């Protein structure tokens, strides 16, 4: 049986963690980005399909390629973030299933149903984006996930000629707490959950 993590860890991962819009000028190393992936890759996905593909944008040149795709409200916080991750999904993720799920012919589940393949890739890459956020928090980083961007522009600018399609963006760095908004409420258990 697994042991519960400490209250301090729960605070870091969930209750005290915030979505950041402003950033300190502290760089995030490539080694730290590798550590993030080394943690997030263990999060569960359907048939271990692991459809997420991540581009970590760290350079001014990369940010300029991204700039035209950003909504006005997301522009400044993205350009000043040390790293912006494009979380994409591979529309042909199933080609890796003989490696990732060798227990049966899982590839055929998806080659026979393009709709199932797309739904699976999008849903599971979204789950993997959440794992990335938790991994960042576990390593002492802050994040700012965003869906306010032009997906087609991102796909054309970064994934043209490939099987990748963008899902969401996540700014990563060390947040400037002086730029946080007041914490917003969440739904109560009674409002969001049911017991049968």
From Swiss-Prot:
Judging by the UniProt lineage, the source's domain of life is Bacteria
Instruction: State the top-level EC class.
Output: oxidoreductase
One Pfam match, given by its short name, reads Nitroreductase
Q: Which GO terms describe its biological process?
A: nitrogen utilization; uracil catabolic process
Entry keyword annotation includes Oxidoreductase: yes
Q: Which reaction does it catalyse?
A: 3-hydroxypropanoate + NADP(+) = 3-oxopropanoate + NADPH + H(+)
Q: Which UniProt keywords apply?
A: Flavoprotein, FMN, NAD, NADP, Oxidoreductase
InterPro entries per the UniProt record, alphabetical: Nitroreductase, Nitroreductase-like, Nitroreductase_HadB/RutE, RutE-like
GO MF terms here are: 3-hydroxypropionate dehydrogenase (NADP+) activity
Cofactor names: FMN
- Role noted for this protein: May reduce toxic product malonic semialdehyde to 3-hydroxypropionic acid, which is excreted.
Protein's UniProt name: Probable malonic semialdehyde reductase RutE
Q: Which organism is it from?
A: Escherichia coli O8 (strain IAI1)
Q: Tell me the gene name.
A: rutE
